[in-house]
C-alpha cells in the first residue's frame, strides 16, 4: 500500500514542479531571453538593497512632479556614447543612485491611475509623491529598470511608440519591446502603458533646401509639388497620428488610454516651420486625450509641479532626470521646487528666481537687490513655486530704483504672458502682457511728487481680479485671471 501511494505523491510533486516552472518561465522568459551582463547590477539590488517599505507622509501633496527617463545603458557604453545619446539616456549606476536617493529622502512613486484621480480632484496623495515615466517603449527602459523598481517598491509609466512596439511579435534583437513583452510588464503590476506616438515619432522634410524637423510640429515639404502640405492636410495628419496611437493601444490591451506624451517633447512651441502649429497640436490632443505631457527644464524658474483643478491641469509638465544630476542633486531639485504656501515672507534671495536678473541680498539681510543680467536693459525675478497662490496680496517696499518704471508681476506664465502693477513717475498702471503685446488695462494718476521709499502692492482678490496700489492710490482690474507665478 505504501509504495503506490509514495509513487503517486512523487508524481504529484514532479507535476507541480513542472507546471510551476512553466508558470515562472511564462512570466520570466523575456527576462531570460533578453538578459545582458549589465542587468546583473540591477538584479543584485534585489538582494543587497531591497527596501520595499513605503514611508507614508502625513502631509498632503500640493502638487506632483513627473520625472522623465529614456534608456538605461551599461556604464561603459554610456561613457563612450555620442553627445546626443548621453543627453537622452542615463547610465545604470546613475539611475540607481538617483532612485535610491529619492527613496531615502521619502519620495514614493504613484500609479498612472493615482495621478489621473489626483489631477481630476478625486483623490489626495501624500507629500513627496511622484510619477516616474519612460518614453518610446525601448527594451533598455525595462530590463535593467524593473529589478530596481521591484527592490524599491516603485511603479512606472511607459509611453510607447505604437508602430515600433505593437506591430511586431517578440524578437530578441529588436530595440523596442513587443506587444507580448508589454503585456508581461503590465501583468507585474509595476508598469502602466500610455501613448507617445504612432508613426509620427520621426523627422520629415520641412523645406526645399532639404531641411528636416519633427514630424508632428512641422508641415511637410512636398518636393514633387514644390509646396508644403496644406493647413487642412497638416491638421488632419496631426489628429490622425494621435487617434492611431490611442486606438492601437486600446485595441491591443482593451483599456482606455487617456495620456499622451508629445514626441521629442515638441508640441509646436519650438523648431517649427508653421506659426499655427502649437494651436493645431494643442487642439488635436485635447480632442483625443485627457492629459498631454511636455518637458520643462528644472532651471527655467517655472513651476514644474502639477496641480489639480487648475486651468492647465490637462497639460502636464515633466522634468528630465539628467544624467548630470547626482542623486542628491535630483532630490534637491524636487524639494526646492515644492509649492510655496501662504503666508509667505521674504527671507533670502534663494527664494527668488532671477528670470533675467542677478539676485542678491542686501548686506544686512533687510532686502533684495535686482540688477541687470548680461546685456538686458531690465531686471526681472519671480518668487519660486508660487503658481497656486490665490486671494492674496504681495507687498514690496521699494527703496530706490534706476530706470523708467518698476513692476510687481502676477499670473506669470512666461516672459511674454503676465499681469503687472507698474509704477512710473506720475502714474500707477495695471499692465497685461500677452503674446508679446503689452496693454495698460487701467491707470490712475498719482501725485507727481510721490517719492520712494514706498510700498508697492499687487494682489489677487477673491474674484480673481488684479488689485494694485502705491501708498494711498489703488486700482482694480476689470477682467479675471487664472494661475501663474507671482
Language-model segment annotations:
Residues 1-18:
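N-terminal Sec-pathway targeting helices
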Residues 25-129, 314, 318, 323, ...:
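N-terminal pre-catalytic segment of deacetylase/amide-hydrolase enzymes
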Residues 49-54, 115-118, 141-146, 170-186, ...:
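Alpha-helical scaffolding within the catalytic cores
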Residues 67-74, 128-130, 150-267:
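Metal-dependent polysaccharide deacetylase catalytic core of the NodB/CE4 family, i.e.
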Residues 161, 220-225, 230, 255-259, ...:
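His/Asp/Glu-enriched short active-site or ligand-binding loop at hydrolase and phosphoryl-transfer sites
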Residues 332-360:
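Extracellular carbohydrate-recognition regions
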Residues 372-434:
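Secretory/extracellular carbohydrate-interaction modules
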Residues 396, 448-483:
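Carbohydrate-binding surfaces in secreted/extracellular proteins
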Amino acid at each position: 500500500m505504501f509504495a503506490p501511494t509514495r509513487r503517486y505523491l512523487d508524481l504529484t510533486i514532479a507535476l507541480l514542479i513542472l507546471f510551476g516552472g512553466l508558470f515562472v518561465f511564462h512570466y520570466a522568459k523575456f527576462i531570460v531571453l533578453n538578459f545582458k551582463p549589465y542587468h546583473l547590477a540591477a538584479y543584485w539590488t534585489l538582494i543587497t538593497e531591497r527596501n520595499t517599505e513605503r514611508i507614508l507622509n502625513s502631509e498632503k501633496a500640493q502638487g506632483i512632479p513627473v520625472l522623465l527617463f529614456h534608456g538605461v545603458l551599461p556604464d561603459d557604453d554610456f561613457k563612450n556614447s555620442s553627445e546626443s545619446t548621453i543627453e537622452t539616456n542615463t547610465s545604470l549606476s546613475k539611475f540607481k543612485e538617483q532612485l535610491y536617493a529619492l527613496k531615502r529622502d521619502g519620495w514614493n512613486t504613484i500609479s498612472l491611475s493615482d495621478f489621473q484621480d489626483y489631477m481630476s480632484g478625486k483623490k489626495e496623495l501624500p507629500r513627496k509623491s511622484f510619477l516616474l515615466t519612460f518614453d518610446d517603449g525601448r527594451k533598455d527602459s525595462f530590463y535593467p529598470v524593473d529589478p530596481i523598481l521591484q527592490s524599491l517598491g516603485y511603479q512606472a509609466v511607459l509611453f510607447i511608440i505604437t508602430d515600433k512596439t505593437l506591430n511586431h511579435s517578440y524578437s530578441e534583437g529588436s530595440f523596442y519591446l513587443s506587444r507580448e513583452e508589454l503585456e508581461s510588464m503590465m501583468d507585474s503590476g509595476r508598469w502602466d502603458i500610455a501613448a507617445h506616438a504612432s508613426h509620427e515619432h520621426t523627422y520629415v522634410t520641412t523645406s526645399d533646401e532639404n531641411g528636416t524637423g519633427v514630424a508632428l510640429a512641422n508641415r511637410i515639404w512636398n518636393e514633387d509639388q514644390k509646396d508644403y502640405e496644406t493647413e487642412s492636410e497638416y491638421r488632419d495628419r496631426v489628429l490622425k497620428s494621435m487617434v492611431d496611437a490611442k486606438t492601437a493601444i486600446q485595441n491591443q490591451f482593451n483599456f482606455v488610454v487617456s495620456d499622451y506624451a508629445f514626441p521629442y517633447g515638441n508640441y509646436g512651441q519650438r523648431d517649427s516651420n508653421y506659426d499655427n502649429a502649437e494651436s493645431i497640436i494643442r487642439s488635436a490632443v485635447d480632442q483625443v486625450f485627457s492629459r498631454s505631457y511636455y518637458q520643462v527644464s528644472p532651471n527655467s524658474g517655472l513651476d514644474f509641479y502639477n496641480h489639480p483643478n487648475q486651468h492647465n491641469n490637462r497639460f502636464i509638465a515633466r522634468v528630465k532626470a539628467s544624467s548630470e544630476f547626482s542623486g542628491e542633486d535630483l532630490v534637491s531639485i524636487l524639494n526646492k521646487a515644492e509649492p510655496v504656501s501662504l503666508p509667505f515672507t521674504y527671507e533670502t534671495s534663494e527664494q527668488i528666481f532671477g528670470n533675467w536678473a542677478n539676485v542678491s541680498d542686501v548686506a544686512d539681510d533687510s532686502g533684495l537687490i535686482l540688477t541687470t543680467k548680461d546685456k538686458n536693459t531690465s531686471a526681472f525675478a519671480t518668487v519660486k513655486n508660487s503658481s497656486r497662490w490665490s486671494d492674496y496680496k504681495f507687498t514690496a517696499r521699494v527703496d530706490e530704483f534706476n530706470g523708467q518704471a518698476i513692476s510687481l508681476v502676477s499670473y506669470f506664465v512666461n516672459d511674454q504672458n503676465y499681469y503687472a502693477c507698474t509704477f512710473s513717475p506720475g502714474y500707477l498702471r495695471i499692465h497685461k502682457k500677452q503674446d508679446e503685446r503689452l496693454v495698460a488695462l487701467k491707470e490712475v494718476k498719482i501725485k507727481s511728487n510721490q517719492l520712494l521709499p514706498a510700498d508697492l502692492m499687487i494682489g489677487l482678490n477673491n474674484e480673481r481680479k488684479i488689485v494694485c496700489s502705491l501708498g494711498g492710490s489703488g486700482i482694480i482690474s476689470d477682467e479675471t485671471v487664472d494661475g501663474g507665478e507671482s
